[in-house]
Amino acid sequence: MKLYGLIGACSFVPHVALEWVKIRENADYEFEPVTRELIKSPEFLSLNPRGAVPVLVDGDLVLSQNQAILHYLDELYPNSKLFGSKTVRDKAKAARWLAFFNSDVHKSFVPLFRLPNYAKDNETLAHTIRQQAVEQILDQLAVANEHLESHIYFGENISVADAYLYIMLNWCKAVKIDFSHLTQLSAFMQRVETDQAVENVRKSEELKV
C-alpha cells in the first residue's frame, strides 16, 4: 500500500491514519512524498487526473479524495479505530467533524494559498479576498473551539478528524493567522502532538510548529 502526498498538506491526515494502522495492527505501508511539479506530470496524472493529493494505491485500487481514503482504511482496518471508536454512533460523530473540516474549513484556505486569476493583478482586491478568507476561517475555528470547551477530541478518542484540524492549525501558523483568542486550540494541538503516530508523521514530513 502506497500513499502519495505533499509534505504538510491535507495528505498528512491519511499519512497519520496509515501510521496508526502500522502501530496498532502491524500493517506496513509506503509514503511517497511528491512535489507540486510532479503532481502535474503524466505519470502522476495517470493516477489522479485532477493532479491532487492524497492518492492511495492498494494493489489495483487507486483512490483519491481524503474522505474516500479514510473510510476505506477504516473498513480495511477496523481495529485501528481511525474514527476514534468501533461503534456506529461514535464513528458517525467523528465523521461529521471530518466532513466539516474537509469540506468547509479546508476550502476557506484556498484563497490564501492560490488567489483567483481575476485578483492576481489587483492588490486591493487580493487583500480583500485574503482578509475575508481569514475571517471565515476564524469563524469556522470558533465552532471547533466551542466543541473543545467540553470535549478532548472530535471523536470518542483521537481520530482522523483531529488530525485534520491539527494540520490546518499548522497552516494557520504558516500564513500567520492568529487564533490565540480561541483558547482551546493551542492546548488541542499539544494533546494531538503527544500521539505517537502524529509524532512519527511530523518527523517524517519534517513539520515545524
UniProtKB/Swiss-Prot annotation:
Name the UniProt record assigns to this protein: Glutathione S-transferase
Membrane-spanning parts: none
Quaternary context: Homodimer.
Gene3D superfamilies listed in its UniProt record: 1.20.1050.10, Glutaredoxin
Source species taxonomy: Bacteria, Pseudomonadati, Pseudomonadota, Gammaproteobacteria, Pasteurellales
EC number per UniProt: 2.5.1.18
Residue ranges of domain GST N-terminal in the record: 1-81
Catalytic activity entry: RX + glutathione = an S-substituted glutathione + a halide anion + H(+)
